[in-house]
């Protein structure tokens, strides 16, 4: 069996329309991505599956887009597991990611109703981490090759 190696995030792109007081268009985000990736060879871009127009913009520009697995609770659990196993680490350069890890909290009102979900505030970097970990590093179901026949 192949051991998965550690993933190191050594840089980040971060923009908050709320903090900056101005939203960007999908084209502006795509321009930023191209500039940020300058000279970097990538296989694909992982995107929130709800961002249909951004996916269309990236596809139009020739990027291969992977729609992120977006189950929040399971994604958070997997991120916690990978962090504890040191399968993902973050450089000090990733200040916004580190800041968001420190401020990521569970929604108390949702918990009163039996829901596990985080407060949806200052979570752009956390969403990006969760999308990567859950979509790319998530456990794949293994086939039992010893069993013959159907389901």
Regions found by a protein language model. Name each.
Residues 9-120, 139, 149-151:
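Mg2+-dependent endonuclease catalytic cores in nucleic-acid-processing enzymes, primarily RNase H-like
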Residues 3-8:
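Short, small-residue-biased leader/transition segments that mark boundaries at the very start
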Residues 117-140:
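Acidic, Mg2+-coordinating catalytic module of metal-dependent nucleases/exonucleases
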């Amino acid at each position: 069996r192949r051991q998965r190696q550690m993933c190191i995030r050594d840089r980040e792109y971060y923009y908050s329309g709320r903090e900056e007081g101005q939203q960007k268009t999908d084209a502006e985000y795509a321009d930023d991505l191209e500039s940020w990736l300058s000279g970097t060879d990538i296989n694909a871009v992982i995107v929130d599956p709800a961002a249909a127009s951004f996916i269309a913009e990236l596809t139009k520009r020739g990027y291969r887009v992977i729609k992120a697995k977006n189950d929040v609770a399971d994604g958070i659990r997997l991120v916690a597991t990978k962090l504890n196993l040191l399968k993902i680490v973050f450089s000090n350069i990733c200040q916004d990611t580190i800041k968001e890890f420190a401020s990521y909290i569970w929604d108390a009102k949702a918990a009163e109703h039996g829901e596990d979900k985080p407060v949806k505030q200052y979570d752009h970097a956390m969403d990006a981490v969760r999308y990567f970990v859950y979509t790319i590093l998530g456990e794949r179901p293994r086939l039992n090759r010893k069993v013959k026949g159907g389901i």
